[in-house]
Amino acid sequence: MSRGRINDRRPLVIGHRGASAYAPENTHAAFRMAMDDAADGIELDVRLARDGVPVVIHDATLDRTALVRGEVESCDSTELTECRVGEWFNLRHPKHAQESFAYESIPTLAQVFESYGSRLIYVEMKCEDAARRPSLARAVVELTRAHGLAGRVVVKSFEHDALSEVKRLAPEIRTAALFGRSWPRPLVSGARIIAAAERCGADEISLHRSLLRKSTVEGARGRGFDVLVWTANSPFWLRRAFALGLRAVFTDCPADMHNWYTHHIPGDAGRRENG
């Protein structure tokens, strides 16, 4: 079985919500910083606004990042893109605060595609309401196709039914099945993870680092999956990812991780072609 696996000397370094250790997550500032920091790509979260426009934000509410009360799905995209989502970062991380961060707003997915479509983009669909997942999947597929990015966008989600819908609509778009800390780690087997990924037709398996085991990786690769790990913010996880031959690591600090690879991986560890 082949799922278009991409092999190379080292895992890709993907900015998790951009360079989110040093700039407000899921903002242009974080995405630009990740690109400037030699990340191979960026990762972001999308939700549907009330008017059906995919917007880039992790939480279901605005409380944490916009410092105002409200639910994302209860607001139109025009309202959401006016929300400032950087001041919270300055307050929580004064060491990395910048005055300009306070003016960062919620981007739309279309804006991200227009600005960063030359690089690899992992789009995580967030939707707790199962009834709305087909609409979110359709909107992401339509934007990906409209921008000609089927070869550079990978759609991922914990909601595997949403990934099945993406594959039904657009078999050419790669998808990644997410598995997080909520899985019962002492009990879950690699076989269960692989079976779940196969059921939704995923191309890649994205594991929380607590689920990263050699047997799982080998089993997944034997079934044709690429394997990813999140969130890797220390050299320990980079060494592990390299040793296991993972496709990518998701990190909040891409500059630090890229520099570590550059200085510790023998041979050509520079940026590789994104598939």
Language-model features: locations:
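Phosphate-group recognition and catalysis centered on beta-loop-alpha active-site segments
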Residues: 1-275
